[in-house]
């Protein structure tokens, strides 16, 4: 007996793939910033869950912050390769379990990172195989509907050059999702399907 066909198995029917193919990506040129990538992994469900981590308090930077799996690019590595490698290192996500859809808009951080978010889909069962590593204190998987329902906090920050940038915060189940992670989530929640 074969399993019923899941329409999201066909990448052309995936609403996130369709959304991504119909938009123009913003790529930044920031030669003095350190390159990094994160994996924005959404489950293949009617109300997708997004894979996030709570960073370990033992790390030298961004202790306890909520983040997508990700990190700096190694020499010769593409953002997609880095995002998949980091997700495997941080939460043991098998790269073969990820259906890659493409890159989202580049973002930068005030501490000098130029980040490329890479959008991918995973089966809900893939979440059962994840595990916490020394870099991660906890794995969290809020649904997009849950994040859309929380009261979004909007702030503005002035950078040293005088540029004002928006800051977003998503208070979710006693956790504070903010910074670059909240910015990428904001773009997904405001512009993406659903």
From Swiss-Prot:
GO molecular function: coenzyme A diphosphatase activity; magnesium ion binding
Pfam families per record: NUDIX
Cofactor(s) the protein requires to work: Mg(2+); Mn(2+)
InterPro entries documented for this protein: CoAse, NUDIX_hydrolase-like_dom_sf, NUDIX_hydrolase_dom
Glycosyltransferase recorded as keyword: no
Record-annotated Nudix hydrolase domain positions: 33-181
EC class: hydrolase
Gene3D superfamilies named in the record: Nucleoside Triphosphate Pyrophosphohydrolase (3.90.79.10)
EC number: 3.6.1.77
Keywords linked to the UniProt accession: Hydrolase, Magnesium, Manganese, Metal-binding
Reaction(s) catalysed (UniProt annotation): CoA + H2O = (R)-4'-phosphopantetheine + adenosine 3',5'-bisphosphate + 2 H(+)
Motif (Nudix box): 71-92
Binding residues annotated for Mg(2+), in chain numbering: 86, 90
CDD domains: NUDIX_CoAse_Nudt7
Gene Ontology BP annotations: coenzyme A catabolic process
Entry-linked PANTHER family: MITOCHONDRIAL COENZYME A DIPHOSPHATASE NUDT8, NUDIX HYDROLASE
Protein family membership: Belongs to the Nudix hydrolase family. PCD1 subfamily.
Subunit architecture: Monomer.
Protein name as it appears in the record: Nudix hydrolase DR_1184
């Amino acid at each position: 007996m074969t399993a019923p066909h899941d329409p999201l198995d066909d990448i052309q029917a995936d609403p996130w793939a369709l959304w991504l193919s119909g938009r123009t990506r913003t790529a930044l040129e920031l030669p003095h910033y350190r390159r990094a990538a994160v994996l924005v992994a959404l489950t293949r469900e009617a109300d997708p869950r997004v894979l996030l981590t709570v960073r370990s308090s033992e790390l030298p930077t961004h202790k306890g912050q909520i983040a997508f799996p990700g990190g700096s690019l190694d020499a010769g590595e593409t953002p997609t390769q880095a995002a998949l490698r980091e997700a495997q290192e941080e939460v043991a996500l098998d790269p073969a379990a990820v259906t890659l859809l493409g890159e989202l808009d580049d973002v930068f951080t005030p501490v000098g990172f130029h980040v490329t978010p890479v959008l991918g889909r995973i089966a809900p069962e893939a979440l059962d195989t994840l595990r916490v590593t020394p870099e991660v204190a906890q794995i969290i998987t809020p649904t997009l509907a849950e994040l859309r329902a929380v009261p979004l906090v909007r702030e503005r920050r002035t950078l040293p050059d005088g540029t004002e940038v928006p800051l977003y915060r998503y208070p979710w189940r006693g956790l504070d999702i903010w910074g670059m992670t909240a910015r990428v989530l904001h773009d997904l929640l405001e512009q993406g399907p659903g």
